[in-house]
Amino acid sequence: MLRYFVLFAALVLQGAAAFAAGVSREVFPLERGGVQLHLERYQVGEGEKTPLLMAHGLTYSSHEFDVDYGDYSLARFFADNGYSVWLLDIAGYGRSQKVQDGFMPNSDYAAEDIAAAAKRVLELTKAKKVNVLGWSWGTVTSGRFAAKYPELVDKLVLYAPIVAGLVKADVTAPFNKNTWTHAAGDFQVKADKTIDYDVMEPPVAATFLSNCWRYDGEGSPNGGRRDLLVAPNERLIPTAQVKAPTLLIVGDKDEYVTALLCQEALKTLPKGSELKVIKGGAHAMMMEKPYYKAFREAILNFLKK
C-alpha cells in the first residue's frame, strides 16, 4: 500500500495546484541559541498582510501545512485569503539545523523558537501582533508561547489540542525512528486497518508522505514526545494563562483529544474564545476530503472576527 504512495508521489508533485501560481515563497534567516531555524513566508502579492505563524506537530515539520495537491494546502489557503503565512521548523526538525541532543527541543524550548520567529515576523511585517496556529504538539508549544508572551499574540488557534498527557510511558531514545507507516499513522482507516480513501484522497496522502521523507528523513527529536507521554491527569497547555482569544478546533474522531477535555480548557480561556467540533474529522482533518473545507473556513471566520 505504501509502495503505491512512493511510486505515485512523483506524479503528484508535478501536478497542478490550486494556489501555486499566485503564492510567492521566501525564506528568512533566523537564528536562536546558535541554531539556524527555517522560517518561510507564503504570500500573495505585496503590501500589508496580517501575519499568521504556524507551529508544526511532533515528528514531522512545517511542510505538513503545505500539502500542495489541489487546494489542500492550508498555508496557501490563508495566503490566498490575505494573510502572510509563516512556517517555522523547530530546532532539529525539517529544514532547521540538526541538534545533537534530541531531548533538547522539548515543548518549552520549542515555545522559545516560536517566540523568536514571532519577533522576527513582527520586525519584518511591522505588525503589532501575530496570529498563531498550532497543530497537535504545536498546540502545546504555541500555547506555552502565547501564555508567556501575551504581548505578541493577537489570536491563537489550537488545532487538535493536546490538552493533557496521552499515556505515561518512558521515552529513552533521544530521536524517533521515522517510517512510512508511522507517517501515515494519523490517517483514518477502515475496519481492516487499510487507509480510508473516501476520507483521505490517495494523492493527498502521497504528497504528505513524500514530503515527510524528503524533509524529515529517518529521524526526528524526541523531546516533545517525552513531554506528551505523561499521565492523563497532567495538563500540558497553560490555557488559564493565555490572554489572546483562542479557537479550539477538534474532530470528534481524534484519538488524541476529546471534546470534553476541550470544553474543560475553554472554561479557562479569555472572552472571545470558542470551541469548534468537526463531526467525523480526525487528527489530520486538514487533509481529509469531507472535512478540510469546513475546518479551514471555521478558522478563517474566527480570525476575521
Each predicted region: which residue ranges?
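Conserved alpha/beta-hydrolase "acid-adjacent" motif
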Residues: 255-261
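Conserved alpha/beta-hydrolase
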Residues: 72-97
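Catalytic histidine-centered segment of alpha/beta-hydrolase-like enzymes
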Residues: 281-292
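Alpha/beta-hydrolase
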Residues: 167-249
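Short substrate-entry loop that stabilizes the transition state in hydrolases
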Residues: 58-69
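N-terminal cap/lid segment of alpha/beta-hydrolase-fold proteins
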Residues: 21-47
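Alpha/beta-hydrolase active-site loop
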Residues: 104-124
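Short beta-strand element of the alpha/beta-hydrolase
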Residues: 49-57
